């Protein structure tokens, strides 16, 4: 009787048009239900039956219904799926050839039915790691989710799984590129000055093989120091547009992961033909500049193509020990002693000048994983930045400033690192926060390089980093740009790196531009697309380093879970759900859930905005506080470390 009834169809249409519909992001929970977050302001409850049609992270439109005075979201249309390509673990039941894959994500617990493509012939076992692509979604008319396995990664118990899974997840290479037939040294009509008689030295870690910078210094009659920075020249072997150049462009950077690296260039180039090894004649690009007695750079900046020969491979710790008068190491000759002594003087001059005229980053330790041949973590050692590290840092910053100036003045373009300081849209919040802390600041001034530097120096004088940490939330991210621009974070009006061409494609580009200036030839400006590719690769490499690190930290700290072992930790972030802390001894990041801070939720307030935890109206914790914690739990499946404060 109601079939094809026009009145009923009209009523349905009216109800449909009157129903509120919103677009938002699905947020899953571990309990089966979820929420639809709309513009970060409003969230709607998604009951378990409706959650079976969507996945955490899906962007959807949903109809909003009211049930017992509660607004409920019913997802209707998929706008953008959370999962496209993903990695996960194969699930397989005994005596059943069907396969499922569980995505490797903390909030995706359900196994997805899957099958391999015809090209994937590996006989999958339960627990194997694989990469897959989503093919079916319930909101796209399918009965359920379904994925297609596009590749095998490794078996379940492979101790190198953290590396192989992470590299596959981010679509990054696992191996060094191979040498190509067209990779031959070809300078064309470029003339090289022979500087092999000068006592250039390299200073690196003991295990470094890809040495790309060497230093030489001489004292002048007027008291200035003539600093020469020699940088390895892979562009002598790699022509622009060649096969190897395209590979380097794609990789963009050497990928440094805990335990090993995946180079941008073939190892025979990066660790042999181009590496500035001791007593080996190598092509190099040299920057020469005077360091005046007050630390200022002279106006005699010069770049030229050269042959150099490093006279010694020095090691950071040994040079630092000698300068700090500890240990037993001695330089091999008086000439090397002179070089080290003068380089220390150069470093002191430049550091003092930067303190007064630019900005200096606070020293933060590096953490190095010591692994055995099977990928087990034997130890994690803290490597502090020492005197020799600062020598190399000052020399590299000096040479990058010189390159930035020459590229700007001679060409007007190059690959520049640009950082614009505070986000203009948030500058009023910065001013308000500073005024609350008795710092008088003006909006217009804070958006200038000088005003930013003045504020940073004032914050550096504070007894704690609490205000500094809160202010950093309002800063922009550093960008890679094809034109000059200021770098507020360093305190310079322009900054362009060129000192690591073996490891960074951006530095290879700047090498070619500097060579064009030396040879007085025309050259094209780098494209915005190239800069975007460099930035994206840098982001992926950093995520890969973090992911592998998280996995290894979880392995390393698992034996301490549930024990009374104490760790000193710094509070690095405060969210509504609790604290994130960094363990001082090894650099691991752990999470302290809010209930571990105080049992009565109504008496507890965790505020990211103020950077504080308030218990019963009193500030109990704040950013950068140092506290003692113990490891409560290590969740290996999500690589999460859960800690709690010691009583």
From Swiss-Prot:
Its EC number is 3.1.13.1. Residues 192-519 form the RNB domain. The keyword NADP does not apply. Pfam families: OB_RNB, RNB, S1. Residues 564-646 form the S1 motif domain. It is found in: Cytoplasm. It is an enzyme of class 3 (hydrolase). GO terms for cellular component: cytosol. PROSITE patterns: RIBONUCLEASE_II. GO terms for molecular function: exoribonuclease II activity; RNA binding. Belongs to the RNR ribonuclease family. RNase II subfamily. Involved in mRNA degradation. Hydrolyzes single-stranded polyribonucleotides processively in the 3' to 5' direction. This is Exoribonuclease 2. The gene is rnb.
